[in-house]
Amino acid sequence: MPSALDLRLEAAYNLITGPGGPIQLGSVERFGHQLPFISNAPTNLADYVAFFAAQHGDATFLVEGDERLSFKQVYMAARQVAAGLVEGHGVQRGDRVGLAMRNANAWCVSYIGILMAGGCATLLNGWWQGGELAAGILDSEAKLVIADVQRAARLEGVEHGAKIVTLDLTQPIDLAVAPITGSSRDPARSAPPPCCRR
């Protein structure tokens, strides 16, 4: 027989996971089995970033040296990267876009931007040398590679078939991703999306 505590815990669980709860559970059939899932959760990583930008707007999300980026700043920068990839670099749904750089705020923003653009982020090992990077690019069929200065230099003179966009990671995020987004400040791209307006 359940104790009073068991009953209270079950009631709390049902409030949280039941209809209208913050973690509403549903089920989905996969491979002949019914599996539980959170039915009101964002469906992909780009939607998660939008969700957390709306929830935590100005709270710090990424830190690199002296640069601190809020959830809102990361989301807006990633939207600009996505627009730049589509409009400026012709990225279409399913295109593989390589990422060859060290850990940095611009890596995270570029990764999210690739996903928002519909691309498939192809992560290339930052320790690889030119031939290894080229092999990874060729094997993945990446049409575009976003690289930091050091990784881009390793690819010079090595055949790989991709367009390389070089980012200067010593710059603040807006300037670091400018080779992707373009130098113009399109107000439509800079305006906060509905999730981030307060």
Q: Where on the chain are the PLM-derived regions?
A:
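Structured catalytic cores of enzymes that bind and process phosphorylated ligands/cofactors
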Residues: 32-35, 123
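A short N-terminal helical cap/helix-turn-helix that marks the beginning
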Residues: 2-21, 39-60, 76
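Conserved pre-ATP/AMP-binding loop-to-beta segment of ANL
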Residues: 57, 179-198
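Structural motif detector for alpha-helix initiation sites
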Residues: 45, 71-74, 130, 175, ...
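Conserved AMP-binding/adenylate-forming core of the ANL superfamily
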Residues: 37-41, 50, 58-112, 129-134, ...
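Conserved S/T- and glycine-rich ATP-binding loop of Class I adenylate-forming
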Residues: 97, 114, 145, 198
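AMP-dependent adenylate-forming
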Residues: 20-30, 47-70, 195-197
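Structural core segment of the AMP-binding/adenylate-forming
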Residues: 1-15, 116-183, 187
